[in-house]
Amino acid sequence: MTDVIGLYLNPPQQAMVLCVDEKSQIQALDRTQPGLPLKKGRCGTMTHDYKRHGTTTLFAALEILQGKVIGQCYQRHRHQEFLKFLRTLDKEFPGQVPLHLVMDNYGTHKHENVRNWLKRHPRFVLHFVPTSSSWLNLVERWFGHLDQKAIRRGVFRSVEDLKASIEAFLTAWNKDPKPFVWTATVESITEKLRTLEKIQPGCTSPRRRKRTT
């Protein structure tokens, strides 16, 4: 946790810090009936019944200083797709500038093929957040914006419709990117975790995450 927060509070010079994660199994949902639009005196409504038309997984990297996001959708979220995304980042940031990647310790990120690729590309430096601490990864905040504004109330008749909505949101965001500013120190976070543990013992213990290779 210390090194991740250190990157946020004091980013290294002559290097880039990217918060990386995948939003997996995003569903393309089509409502069975049209919703009623928002109007004066009445909230917009939509049916709770829906049809599923498949899923996609979004890999995204948030550059913390400018707030720009690089994202790509894939059908699955195995180590093969993660490697493709790493190659995309390698092209997106050409040259030899060091790239510090903040991510969780999901098994896909530690696959042998990924480790071998990283050995051949030493400018990629990985920083893993502690288990069950995805809130430390700033790209999760961006995922929240994406979900609220482009996915949650959307109507998607195909996976392609869903991907088009995600890509449109990405394009609009990057025209006027907004960085997420981190202010909490390690000491303040540690104190809050101690307080939570006193209130609800065991609530800060790591939880296992299903692995996908």
Explain the meaning of each model-derived region.
Residues 69, 139-161, 172-174:
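Active-site proximal helix-loop segment of RNase H-like, two-metal nucleases, encompassing DDE(D)
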Residues 77-78, 101-112, 131-136, 161:
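Acidic, metal-coordinating catalytic cores used for nucleic-acid/nucleotide bond scission
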Residues 161-213:
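C-terminal domain-tail junction helix/linker
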Residues 18-20, 99-103, 127-130, 183-184:
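Short beta-strand segments
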Residues 44-50, 118-138, 154-156:
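RNase H-like polynucleotidyl transferase catalytic core
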Residues 1-87, 193, 197-199:
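Extended, low-complexity cationic-aromatic segments
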Residues 14-15, 96-98:
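Short coil/turn segments at beta-strand junctions that form active-site/ligand-binding loops
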